[in-house]
Swiss-Prot record:
SUPFAM superfamilies: Ribosomal protein S7 (SSF47973). NCBIfam families: PRK04027.1 (NF003106), uS7_euk_arch (TIGR01028). HAMAP family: Ribosomal_uS7_A (MF_00480_A). This is Small ribosomal subunit protein uS7. Transmembrane segments: none annotated. PROSITE patterns: RIBOSOMAL_S7. The lineage of its organism: Archaea, Thermoproteota, Thermoprotei, Thermoproteales, Thermoproteaceae. Keywords: Ribonucleoprotein, Ribosomal protein, RNA-binding, rRNA-binding. GO terms for cellular component: cytosolic small ribosomal subunit; ribosome. Pfam families: Ribosomal_S7. Belongs to the universal ribosomal protein uS7 family. GO terms for biological process: ribosomal small subunit assembly; translation.
Amino acid sequence: MSAIFGEQLPKSSRVEYIGDVPIIEECPRDVKTLDGEPILLFGKWSYEDVVVRDPGLRRYICLKPVILPHTEGRYQNTRFGKARIPIVERLINLMMRPGRNTGKKHKAYNIVKRAFDLIYYKTGKNPLQVFIDAIINTAPREEITRIIMGGIAYSVSVDVSPQRRLDLALRWITEGARACSFNNPKPIEECLADEIIAAAANDPKSYAVRKREELERIAAASR
C-alpha cells in the first residue's frame, strides 16, 4: 500500500493496481441512449470526434458521454476519483468559486453551457474539442518544489504528474475568466469563452497560458 505522510491508505475497489501502482483506465466513449442514438453534451455537442492529443493526459480527461455533467459527488471519497468525473463537470465545479458562489451549481452550469455556445459561434468548431485543446496547451510539464539540505532550502525543478497538470490547467482557465469579468461589463460566460479560445490557440493573451509559461520558466531556471 502507498504511504503518504507516514499513513497507510487503503486501496480503492474502483481502481486496479499493479503492485502498489494504480492503473487509471480511460472513460468509456461508446455510451449511447436506449434507442442507439449518440449522447450529446447539453443535447448539442458530440463526443465522438473529440481527440486528446496529449498521451499523458488521455487517461485523466474523462470524456464519457453524458447529457447533464453532474455525478452528485459519488467519487469524492475515491482515490483518483477525479479521473472518473466528466471533464466538463470539473470545469463547472471550479466555476463555483470564490466563496459567494459556493453551491450555486445551476448558475455555474448555465455559465459553462452559454460559454460553449459562444465558442461555437466564434470558432465554428465543436466547443468540447476547443476546451480539450485549451487544457492541453495550459497544462504545465515542470514546476518547482522546495527541499532542505543541510538546513538550507532550495527550489528544484520537478516533473508534474498528469493529475496535477490537469488540476492546474482547469484552475487557471477559471481564474482567468473570473479576473476578466471583475469590474467589467462583459458577462462571465463571454470571458470564459474568450479564455478557452485563446488558450486553445496557445495565445499569450490567455491568462492560463501566461501562468503556464511563468511556472515553466521558473522551473527551467531551477534545474
